[in-house]
Amino acid sequence: MTTFTLIAQKPRPKPSGTAQPRCIFRAALVIALLTQTGVWGQATTISVDVKVVNLPVTVRDKHGQIVRDLTKDDFILEEDGRAQTIKYFAQETNLPLTLGLLVDTSLSQRNVLNEERTASRSFLDQMLTADKDRAFLIHFDREVELLQDLTSSKDKLRAALESLNAPSLKRASQDDPDDRTGSHHGGGTLLYDAIYLASNELMKKQPGRKAVVILSDGVDRGSKESLESAIEAAQRTDTLVYSILFTDPHHDGGGGMGRGAGWPGGGGGGWPGGGHGGHPGGGSGRYPQEAHVDGKKILQRISRETGAHMFEVSKTEPIDKIYASIAEELRMQYSLGYTPVKVDAGAEGYHKITLTAKKKDLSIQTRQGYYADR
């Protein structure tokens, strides 16, 4: 079971068993059985599963502006190619928000951390508008650490943001002298592990709206979890994963180096046991070097498959403007709900969702499917 380090706080309990999708709710159907003699018989309670799939949906027009005046009759919904009926429809403004910031603090990000810190502080101040709204902060490099657990306290979150620092090149080299994690490129970047842990250990049991914002160059080095398992963890917990691609033009980081850290004996900490490697045992990644990885495409895939959006910081699209766009989306989403209607309704496994708008020139942003377990 994958865990991460909690700084200055008590560790959260690990989840046990198979993760269940948050879109399944149990309802009790009570049937009173009457006897034929005219005397009331004993009431029998039968529990049945009523599977309600919830979709956070953002709709934009051809100019990229968010559309807010739609009804459920303006959408066409299918699951695995079969038409579905939208039974629940609302705008999500008043639902509680659970928000997570996952900040890449590897060497490749050290020159942009100050800008990220300042913009993140303003973003959290803007998004946490009620006591029911809570946020957490995780940083990841050669380890994954929870700097601030779920809280509605802006002061605690600000303090956690102030503690964000990238490891020094000297420290990374000392931690991994054989350069098994590509320390000259950043000393390990456990992006996939961070997404997996945030989803399973923090988001899994939270109600209402759930979103994570990643600030990274998108290149993973050393995660125990795969890209696919990270995406699946977010999908199973109904978590939107927004990505902000922020690269330092003065850093020579490109390329996806081997997956040394996070595997038994690899570089990086934050995992239980075994020195800086975290996982017990020995050995490093599968290969000393792997092919170049396009971090932008990685972040695009993560966000697309979880129903969110990837943004790229540039001169015309600064990080504070990107945060404003994310805030607007989260405030103006529609919430659609339906009960799957088909022969094998709610069958175990992955179910593909297709949502389209009847009106022309409208684009739909929502998750592409969900997992149903036994």
Label each PLM-derived region with a short phrase.
Residues 25-38:
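Bacterial N-terminal signal peptides
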